[in-house]
């Protein structure tokens, strides 16, 4: 975790060509679990790291843009994202997925993105009686986000 935080906050200060290296976005699904906010740091022209917090969980991820991130263009990406969530009186779980999507970065520093991809989710259910069950399944997961670059 320390290495991730070091890369997220200090590595980008070495001078990459991006003028606006930070993104705050509102998300549905994705690294912020159900609904939440995420902070994304662009660490190079092709890589960004993300931390998210939502109503029921937290998450993190890395996004790789095969082609350079450019303003006023559709930028395709993939990566790896993980989120963990807790539902009071029900249980919790984790979701790991590989997104395939696209983001549009406007000249006014707004961005919008959408992705879908294969996911592996684990849910641990519990009840007041002490009984627990664990379910792991493979499914499709995604993310819709609207954010601001600064």
Where in the sequence are the language-model features?
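Flexible, solvent-exposed loop segments that connect beta-strands
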Residues: 19-21, 47, 84-92, 120-138, ...
């Amino acid at each position: 975790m320390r290495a991730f935080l070091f890369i997220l906050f200090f590595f980008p200060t070495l001078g990459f060509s991006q003028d606006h290296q930070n993104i705050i976005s509102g998300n549905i699904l994705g690294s912020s679990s159900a609904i939440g906010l995420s902070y994304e740091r662009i660490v190079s022209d092709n890589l960004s790291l993300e931390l998210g917090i939502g109503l029921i969980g937290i998450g993190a991820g890395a996004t790789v843009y095969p082609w350079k991130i450019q303003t006023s263009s559709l930028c395709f990406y993939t990566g790896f994202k993980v989120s963990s969530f807790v539902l009071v009186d029900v249980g919790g779980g984790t979701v790991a997925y590989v997104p395939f999507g696209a983001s549009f970065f406007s000249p006014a520093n707004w961005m919008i993105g959408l992705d879908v991809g294969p996911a592996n989710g684990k849910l641990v259910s519990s009840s007041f009686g002490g009984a627990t069950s664990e379910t792991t399944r493979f499914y499709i997961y995604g993310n819709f986000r609207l954010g601001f670059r600064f």
